[in-house]
Design a protein with these regions (language model features):
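Conserved phosphate-binding/catalytic region of the ribokinase-like
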Residues: 3-7, 174, 205-305
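Substrate-binding N-lobe of the ribokinase-like
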Residues: 4, 13, 33-101, 303-304
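Positively charged, low-complexity intrinsically disordered leader regions
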Residues: 6-32
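Ribokinase/PfkB-type carbohydrate-kinase core domain
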Residues: 7-16, 79-93, 106-242
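Hydrophobic pocket-lining residues within nucleotide cofactor-binding pockets
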Residues: 19, 70-72, 249
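Short glycine/proline- and charge-enriched loop/turn segments
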Residues: 31-39, 190, 242-245
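Hydrophobic residues within alpha-helices
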Residues: 53, 77, 154, 260-261
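Short, conserved phosphate/pyrophosphate- and ester-handling motifs at nucleotide-, phospho-/glycolipid
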Residues: 57, 190, 258
């Protein structure tokens, strides 16, 4: 049953991103070359950073539209988005391409290894992009990650439309550096992604304030949100610098990012938005599955550490 989510603001958010099917195998150890290994368990989840962030945004109270592509095997992903209140009218269904998917092995130590297949996520066309942006205006926001193709063209169309652009550069690779990063309004990233954008070698100790400061120097007009794992997160926006600790548990970037964006656009201060995001993340890590674990706004508001 589709849940009604109360909306607090009038602008729309376009999440143009990935839609995946995650096949998660529980194994005693990672399969080796030439080995046939029986899995102890198989779970199938909805996945993709794009899908997860769309759900987080919608559950945080934003009017959220997801654009992307799936194959005929991924129709159930639309049900998951709709149930969370996300508009799926801009998702293209392709008959000759399979939905993007991930084959994930989880071993007894809690580690994993992943094989990704881009599928329909890598079949975005310029024509589809043009059609999508006909539905948005200069008060709206675009959120992108790095799991679909045509990102440079998507950024170009967003700028022509006058939209603000939010970038979560994950997974990080050279495609991100090919984007006009000086046109990004919000960076949501972890310390490793930040160092790669800055062409830094990984230091022995991570200094979040130093790294976020370097990013701010490089992109002075942008708001920088840097997640630091167990150390929490930091944000620089203009002359404002804010640190946020975590609520006892490891941060979930997709959930935290969605709630931070929603908080800022709903008129919260940076400190308030970061605190809300940290609470949402703490709730999410206590549950199974990426998308199902994302809390609704009322749960976050009632959360006590």
């Amino acid at each position: 049953m589709e849940r009604i989510v109360e909306r607090e603001v009038s602008m729309k958010i376009l999440s143009f991103g990935s839609l995946n099917i995650d096949y998660v195998y529980k194994v005693s150890h990672f399969v080796k070359k030439g080995e046939t290994l029986s899995a102890e368990e198989l779970n199938v989840y909805t996945g993709g950073k794009g899908l997860n962030q769309s759900i987080a945004l919608s559950r945080a109270g934003m009017e959220t539209y997801h654009a992307g592509a799936i194959g005929m095997d991924g129709l159930f992903l639309l049900d998951q988005l709709k149930e969370a209140g996300v508009n799926t009218d801009l998702v293209k269904i392709l008959e000759d391409v399979r939905t993007g998917n991930a084959i994930i092995q989880n071993d007894e130590e809690g580690d994993n290894c992943i094989i990704l297949f881009g599928g329909a996520n890598q079949a975005i066309s310029k024509e589809q992009v043009d059609e999508v942006f006909e539905h948005f205006k200069n008060e709206d926001y675009l959120l992108i990650q790095n799991e679909i193709n045509e990102l440079p063209y998507i950024v170009k169309k967003a700028k022509e439309t006058g939209m603000k652009i939010i970038l979560n550069p994950s997974p990080m690779n050279d495609k991100i550096k090919e984007l006009p990063l000086n046109q990004i309004n919000y960076f949501l990233l972890n310390e490793i992604e930040a160092m790669q954008i800055l062409d830094m070698e990984e230091p022995k100790e991570i200094d979040g304030k130093y790294i976020s400061g370097l990013l701010h120097q490089k992109f002075p007009e942008a708001t920088i949100v840097l997640t630091l794992g167990s150390e929490g997160s930091v944000c620089i926006s203009g002359d404002e610098y804010v640190e946020q600790s975590i609520y006892k548990v490891k941060t979930v970037d997709t959930t935290a990012a969605g709630y931070f964006i929603a908080g800022i656009l709903n008129g919260k201060t940076i400190k308030e938005a970061m605190d809300t995001a940290s609470k949402a993340s703490a709730i999410a890590v206590s549950r199974q599955g990426a998308a199902p674990s994302i809390p609704y706004l009322e749960e976050v508001e009632e959360y006590k550490n």
